[in-house]
Regions:
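Phosphate/pyrophosphate-binding catalytic cores of soluble transferases and nucleic-acid-acting enzymes
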Residues: 2-344
């Protein structure tokens, strides 16, 4: 008799016999992506177990910019080691909150981890919702020029005079970049002007036909209907405060979170810091975090909808029906999605 197993919905189905890899033994790179709160983490764990059931080992690589930071657990919904089902996880808790982990820092490290996983003959599952971080690994992605001294000057200018003068100069150099940058985000304004001043493309975007870094790549998007996602995200934010986010942030202050350019501005953490300083009450901190989280989720959906060949599914549908061996090893750009995309 063929072995049988129960899937996430409780249905008992025959387990397929292990098959050889489609690309002459070449391990694959998976990317499980989507908006925050859609169930990417659970799906990635289920996928790794499905692969293991087919005789293929898999390891998970973090592609969430905030989960790189040690001690930032509750506000990032980081999965505790005890809940990782014995599956190796990489690039979680990689830097201190006082440090800055940029996408340019992340890309070579993530790719090195993927190469190490593939060298062991295992599949790598990249999971996260930070679009730029995912793209930097999955696609042939090059970064605009950098000048640390120039950026330091621009950051000082922002502190002294705000973003308005920088936006005016950016508009003179690159009108499209000025129109597209988030004027409320000083870091984005500084970076855009830095790149424009160096003669580069200030706006980082996927090309019309992006090339995959590894041909044996499969892109899986997790989508949730908009109304359901909004309710889920609002509930998650309230749950973070109930779970002790304020105490977590207070414990991170001696570790330098207030000095961390990225960590201190993370959604939820910036609001918790403001509450601890007495600038807002808890209700206002939660409400602002909910608003920013919903806005961020919309941007994530827009980003991932542009991925060619991505296969969209709901988290529960993916656990029941995602076949880890179908179209195995074929480039994502050659696959035809069979599941509708995320809600508009």
């Amino acid at each position: 008799r063929r072995p049988r197993h129960a899937d996430a919905a409780g249905a008992v189905t025959p387990t397929r016999e292990p098959e050889p890899r489609a690309s002459a033994g070449q391990p694959r790179l998976w990317a499980v992506v989507g908006a925050t709160g859609t169930g990417k983490t659970a799906l990635s764990l289920d996928l790794a177990e499905r692969l293991r059931g087919e005789g293929i080992n898999a390891e998970i690589v973090n592609a969430d910019a905030m989960q790189l930071y040690r001690g930032m657990d509750i506000g990032t919904a980081k999965l505790p080691p005890s809940e990782r089902r014995g599956i190796p996880h990489h690039l979680f808790d990689a830097v201190e909150p006082s440090e800055e982990a940029t996408v340019a820092w992340y890309q070579p490290r993530a790719r090195a981890v993927v190469d190490e996983i593939h060298a062991r003959g295992s599949d790598a599952i990249l999971v996260g919702g930070s679009g730029l971080y995912v793209s930097s690994v999955v696609f042939d992605f090059r970064f605009p020029p950098r000048d640390e001294a120039l950026r330091a000057e621009l950051e000082l200018e922002v502190e002294q005079h705000g973003t308005a003068p920088l936006l005016e100069r950016l508009r003179a150099l690159d009108r499209a970049a000025a129109d597209g940058v988030d004027a409320r985000n000083p870091r984005r304004v500084v970076r855009a002007l830095e790149v424009a001043s160096l003669g580069g493309e200030a706006r980082v975007a996927l090309p019309e036909t992006p090339e995959l870094w590894r041909p044996a790549t499969r892109l899986v998007g997790v989508a949730v209907p908009r109304a359901e996602l909004v309710e889920r995200l609002d509930r998650r934010v309230r749950g973070m405060w109930a779970a002790g986010l304020l105490a977590e942030v207070e414990a991170l202050i001696p570790r330098g979170i207030e000095r961390g350019k990225t960590a201190s501005r993370a959604i939820g953490y910036a609001q918790a810091l403001a509450q601890l300083r007495g600038e807002v009450d808890e209700a206002a901190a939660i409400a602002e975090t909910q608003t920013l989280t919903r806005r961020y989720a919309r941007r994530q959906v827009s980003w991932f909808k542009r991925y060619p060949g991505i296969e969209w599914c709901g988290a529960a549908d993916g656990r029941r029906g995602l076949d880890p061996l179908s179209t195995a090893g074929r480039p994502a750009s050659e696959k035809s999605p069979t599941i509708p995309g995320p809600p508009a």
